[in-house]
Amino acid sequence: MLRNSLFVAAAILGVATVHATDIDSYTQGIQQWHAGRVERLTAADGWLSLIGLEWLQPGANRVGSAADNDIVLTAGPAHLGVVTLATDGSMRIVLDQDSHATIDGKAVSEAVLVDDAHATADAAPTKVAFGTASFYVIDRDGRKGLRVKDSEAPSR
């Protein structure tokens, strides 16, 4: 009888130990995932840096932080430039001379914009950067929008 009781006690203790190890491993996995998620969210271009989504209209769209623009941004120069959305869905940007913006890290005055739906493994969507903010074009069922991010957004 004592022998059976010892066997049952040892079996229960063994299961509890294995179970505790599994829980510790599971908890550690959750904590690692959580830390990685927070890091991705708070990154300079993470989701918490999102400050705007502005839909483009066909034709010329004046973009900047001044109230007289077609698309008013919450960050950046008063007059950033003009984004033109053609009837075939192609887009082009012409930057204002005083915008001090870059396109894909280069100081150019105009460029064709590639949206996220037409990006490839070798070519990301075109990124227009100005100060701590930037935007790239998204395509949602044929609608084109500017996804605007700021690395200094209060939400980060």
Outline where the language-model segments fall.
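Well-ordered beta-strand positions
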Residues: 82-84, 129, 138
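Surface-exposed beta-loop interaction hotspot
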Residues: 131-156
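Short, surface-exposed beta-edge/turn micro-motifs
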Residues: 9, 78-79, 143-144
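Forkhead-associated
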Residues: 49-50, 55-125
